Amino acid sequence: MLIHVLGTAQDGGYPQIGCNEACCNLAWENPEFKKYPSSLAVVDESKKKYWIFDITPEVKSQLHLLSAFECSLSGIFITHAHIGHYMGLINLGLEVMNLEEIPVYIMPRMKDFIMGNTLLNQLVENNNINLIPLEADQEVYINNLLSVEAYNVPHRNELSETVGYKIIGKGKTAIYLPDIDSWKNFENKLRSLIDTNDILYIDGTFYDKTEISSRDVSKIPHPEIKETIKMLSDLSPADRKKIHFIHFNHTNDAIRYKSKIHERILDNGFSISRENQQFIIS
């Protein structure tokens, strides 16, 4: 069983709609540099199944990345109600895939959000999806090789709560934490997660908030990568390597391979998520 990275960008992907600045022109002019919104898959080849963590607007292309496994979609875990993390659900209904009873694992407010949204609730009424309630800090057993545990994360919770996920295989464990407002009041939890897990995919939205000039960054809070690196500078080299930044904004040079920022992060001993990376957990 393995984790397969399906996307590494912020909700809008890379390049981002409406952006004609230098940061995005590279990808407009060279489609090979395109990046999908953040998402992971857990693939169980022995049972011919996979589960995805967040279902993005680019899910069509992301699931195609898994076609070589010849496995079927068997469940979806959603972190929160921001568009890059749930909007792919609309592809499961009558107009596109018309799937049947796909388990969608969600927290209580996220369930209320789906049930209260006419478009999404139609998926429930038509039995395309089956909403499976989660509780924070309660392990859910998917099969004899895989279990998952949700934990609450401080983030902009306008429409739902936000969670991260612990993915537990037979041999190794991983953390998926693409969105958080700040490490304030969460640093001890983060350090505990680093101590007790093998790989962590954590919020790398901005390297430095000065990269945003056209928006009020106070309204889109995320920790800066440079501050995360500083905060975790006391980690051992082995623990630093566990940290894989993910969820990069289009303005963040970490998303651009071999950029100075990309290399600076690696030089500090941390890792950068890449699409199609794999990590064995069982």
What does each model-identified segment do?
Residues 1-66, 133-193, 278-282:
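Core dinuclear metal-dependent hydrolase active-site scaffold
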Residues 2, 101-103, 130, 147, ...:
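Residues at the starts of beta-strands that form the adenosine-phosphate
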Residues 10, 83, 111, 207, ...:
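Residue-level marker for beta-strand->alpha-helix junctions and adjacent short loops that shape enzyme
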Residues 48-52, 56-105:
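Active-site metal-binding motif and surrounding structural segment of the metallo-beta-lactamase
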Residues 71, 84, 100, 127, ...:
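Structured loop/turn residues at beta-strand edges in well-structured enzyme cores
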Residues 77, 102-111, 201, 244-246:
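Short internal beta-strands
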Residues 109-119:
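A short, active-site helix/loop in glycosyltransferases that binds the activated sugar's phosphate group
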Residues 171-173, 180-277:
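Cap/insert and terminal regions of metallo-dependent hydrolase folds
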